[in-house]
Amino acid sequence: YSSYCRLWIHVEGDKEPAYYGVYEMIEAIDDKYVKRRKDLFGDHKHNLWKCRWGATLNYNDIHGANIYYDDDSGANYTYELESNTDNFETAKAQLIEFTKNLTQRQGDDFHDWIASVCDVRLLLRTYAVNVAVGMWDDYWNNCNNYYIYFNSSDRDNYKFFFIPYDYDNTLGT
């Protein structure tokens, strides 16, 4: 989430605080973000992925994708594991299996699977908000600027959450 604030800095000895302008405050999406929402997510200790440009969630594309964990190197990866990095290989296998199911299941099989791993209403509401605000730099337009969270490390038994971010250009900041 983001908001704006007016920043004044009070320097000891000065008569009035100094006004520094309007700044954007952005809540980081990290393990603390997930922990603050553990009632929604059902857990806060599992796999949070940052997904950048090219993160299609398509099983046919993921094998050539740049999948790594946050190593503080400053490198940008298509899919970057932000939490639970000690279990990277397990998290990566879960992500790949998720994309396989998302891409290859069809009909009632897909319907039953997606309903079991995702709050479909919440996902559709998220998409509707992105459309309503004209979000042009997101998953649905550029396969970009979103996080996904799996509330379990189990390859088949989890809930998936889609977390969009980076609305600054869309909202005119």
What annotation goes with each model-predicted range?
Residues 1-173:
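Phosphate/dinucleotide-binding and metal-coordinating scaffold of catalytic cores
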